[in-house]
């Protein structure tokens, strides 16, 4: 009986590693988003219950001996969880970068605040975009999609097996980084163009009327232009999420 309980505890510990590693990168599962670390751990524990019998049947005790072979098992689980969390966090990092870029161009970087979603200092637009994307993520079934990926990863990469770090893996990571910057630039590009045109117009105005302090009007004017541009371009920028939401429901 004691040995069986010990095996179940070891299976629970192994099943907990991959969701925990996922939560360290995915903003929605961080302790700042859920309110407390204890609540986050409870949510992660509930995510491990569906896969607990599968891991128990794999006899994880056979991988754990006195030769520290369990270190390879833990390392593989952490790497897989980090990779899933990294891929899932790319859209959230992209919109936060886009918001910080817009606030930098309009001269409002002094108004940084703490974003509990990503647990870091961010700009006003970065916080707005992050919160907006969280809503879109939940209503479009994004959380269910992440959980499906997490559970299917145990089918293709069960505990004891890890990823193959070859040229294809490096190309995949490079593609994810490229996607991160592409999302950031494409999301903020309409507002960036408006602010660049506003700077050009203010520069010409300052050259024709040098006694007028155009920098006093620069930040309010660019802020208004950014807000109007975002209101117009939001339906197009989030078209993919709206389409996926319609398919899901």
Protein language model annotation of sequence segments:
Residues 1-249:
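Hydrophobic alpha-helical segments and their helix-loop boundaries in membrane
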